[in-house]
Amino acid sequence: MRRKRDSYDYVIIGGGSAGSVLGARLSEDKDKNVLVLEAGRSDYFWDLFIQMPAALMFPSGNRFYDWEYQTDEEPHMGRRVDHARGKVLGGSSSINGMIYQRGNPMDYEGWAEPEGMDTWDFAHCLPYFKKLETTYGAAPYDKVRGHDGPIKLKRGPATNPLFKSFFNAGVEAGYHKTADVNGYRQEGFGPFDSQVHHGRRMSASRAYLRPALRRRNLDVETRAFVTKLIFDENNSKKVTGVTFKKNGKEHTVHANEVILSGGAFNTPQLLQLSGIGDSEFLKSKGIEPRMHLPGVGENFEDHLEVYIQHKCKQPVSLQPSLDVKRMPFIGLQWIFARKGAAASNHFEGGGFVRSNDDVDYPNLMFHFLPIAVRYDGQKAPVAHGYQVHVGPMYSNSRGSLKIKSKDPFEKPSIVFNYLSTKEDEREWVEAIRVARNILKQKAMDPFNGGEISPGPQVQTDEEILDWVRKDGETALHPSCSAKMGPASDPMAVVDPLTMKVHGMENLRVVDASAMPRTTNGNIHAPVLMLAEKAADIIRGRKPLEPQYVDYYKHGIDDEKAGAMEDDPFYQY
């Protein structure tokens, strides 16, 4: 994978989730030459750490796969928080948990509230979600889900008896099962969609970029670290190309348009290095400002999560699969048949609920696992166990990203300000109490051998918050650090109608940094949707027709509307 020329119509910086979509879609126009520059390595088909779903814990913290970011000391947690980001073609879609969640329709209604953002409401986003999906778990008559897109989605199957008991425990706690968390009703408990197809990870690179590589007008260059943007000598706001380093050598490539798709960390960093950001801050780092956009690196959002772990009384969990002696058999089963414990991401089910009556739609997300193990591979000291991941979904805490110097290889200063507001603290206490209430229901009695973490000694609000401060981890959903918004918004960076950086020429942003607000759930699906929609904008194509559909609204619809029991197709 190498570039064949020195000038392109489009140069895409970043071959991650958004960059893979753009590379595939923009190269559909045969008269346009497209180059994707990826700083990481290729996602080789033989690389088990990428391709094997259950190996998802191994790339994180490994310098060959992960940029290994860290926040500064978080002021309200008293420690730094590790952030894994994909250093490989496919970006974080090549190392993430493979969970596919659109978010709640009301997330996008919130996106559309500001002036000029009306084309980002749910009706305008839904056709692009459908365009990217092939949803094998959806009913063939389901008009809300996609059935022939490049991202192949497996439903559940959540057949381990612990899943059924967890879903039933949710019902006993006063909630409902839902037919599809990505369909009419997000609120409730049920199987999740995962980006696993025929036992292999379905990354954005696998789905979009690799099938397009046969095109002569698409080039992909890996291990190409972009160090700066090139500007017109006579127009300081017109981008004409990029400079990148590969194998110690500097290269320059020219472009009619440059599209930043480096993600929520890399995109604002490169903008600031290029003189686009808060003018006074840039001057303090010895950088001449080109465009005063104080929102670059601000409005930073993320989801924080914790694991509540339990000992399992019956030998039905997947804990034995963590035994080193069993791993060769599990690995061989996957290599030769793409089956067995290694063929699943094991995030096969969970749920979304409202923690209080003041919120209009779910503010808590649960991932259930029939195993007790941390994301870094540290397992609980029990023969059998299970856990639930939980955290608030739309915290009002906001952080920032700022470069430390003019050196593009120096990692930026990152602070998310987790737990910085009273509302954030309140929702965290509610999250733990709601999760514990579900896990203590009768449906879990046959398996409940007692809480391992945080443990029965953690009970008061302050004890809960202390535990979250000590044990909380990022859910790896950074976003909104170069947000879309109208020019009238002083903190907006990207024009929502063109995806161009305000005040700049030939420069666009298409990735998670452009999200105006984070969504309720894992953010990979919204990033794919955003990139699909942006591709039509960039190509000057007529956008897909908006699709106005009903979706579940608490307090307006019958509380059982869209629940599993309403549709015989969905029974579990």
From Swiss-Prot:
GO BP term, example: glycine betaine biosynthetic process from choline
Reaction catalysis annotation: choline + A = betaine aldehyde + AH2; betaine aldehyde + NAD(+) + H2O = glycine betaine + NADH + 2 H(+)
SUPFAM superfamilies cross-referenced by the UniProt entry: FAD-linked reductases, C-terminal domain, FAD/NAD(P)-binding domain
EC number(s) on file: 1.1.99.1, 1.2.1.8
Protein name: Oxygen-dependent choline dehydrogenase
Active site, renumbered: 477 (proton acceptor)
GO molecular function: betaine-aldehyde dehydrogenase (NAD+) activity; choline dehydrogenase activity; flavin adenine dinucleotide binding
Gene3D superfamilies according to UniProt: FAD/NAD(P)-binding domain, Glucose Oxidase, domain 3
Species this chain originates from: Staphylococcus epidermidis (strain ATCC 12228 / FDA PCI 1200)
EC category name: oxidoreductase
Binding site for FAD: 9-38
Membrane-spanning parts: none
